[in-house]
Swiss-Prot record:
Residues 251-260 have a biased composition (Basic residues). Keywords: Ribonucleoprotein, Ribosomal protein, RNA-binding, rRNA-binding. It comes from Hyphomonas neptunium (strain ATCC 15444). One of its GO terms (biological process) is cytoplasmic translation. The gene is rplB. Part of the 50S ribosomal subunit. Forms a bridge to the 30S subunit in the 70S ribosome. GO terms for cellular component: large ribosomal subunit. This is Large ribosomal subunit protein uL2.
Amino acid sequence: MALKTFNPTSPGRRQLVLVDRSALHKGKPVKALTQGLSSKGGRNNQGRITVRHQGGGVKRLYRQVDFKRTRWDIPATVERLEYDPNRTAFIALIKYQDGELSYIIAPQRLEVGDTVITSATADIKPGNTLPLKSIPVGTIIHNIELKPQKGAQMVRSAGTYAQLVGRDSGYAQIKLASGELRMVLDSCLATIGAVSNPDKMNEVSSKAGRNRHLGKRPTVRGVVMNPVDHPHGGGEGKSSGGRHPVSPWGKKTRGPKTRNNKVTDRLIIRRRNAKR
């Protein structure tokens, strides 16, 4: 879909660039596939902020998207494409032959009336879901499971895709958009194609209020805080304290690695930030 620009009738519209969503469904979502969603405002059960810069925003209904795609060998027809406020990608409403409705992440080039299916012998076309062992090497994929039958966890946001680059002793080798090369069990499912809405990255909000509608609160620099709030806080005038940049919790930022190792690191063949 194309991008929309606007006449500068106000300062908030001068730089505004949005994705044209005129081809999407304009009505309400399917009621049986939606549920209420309460805003946490970045707080935990003690009421303390655990995630900064969250709060406010427009109320949303949660669309129950099927990330497992476990209805094997039952064709489904794409009824319509919809906007989903809870994610950057568009979603597709599909109807199985037995009448059941479901939402899935819409890949690029998926049109209304197309047929999608989950099958080990499915055609290699956008929207079809197959085990990694059944997908040809070199295929562009998204919606990738990390554990069999757990549901897709990787490559779900707008415009993203990964590439199957090899298979070896029960594992598939997948190259992610970040440049990381990692192994996943070849019994895990993945969907063919790249995720819809690739122009999302080119949107320009143009005003603070548009981010507030999305539930994003301002980011305050540590150097303008008090010493009790941040390691960079305090001092007379615009002083930074003379230390290297750190997070509010004292961890070094802007360069040094602070990530802890995980058991699954052994599945990463090449790190995303490895020098090529």
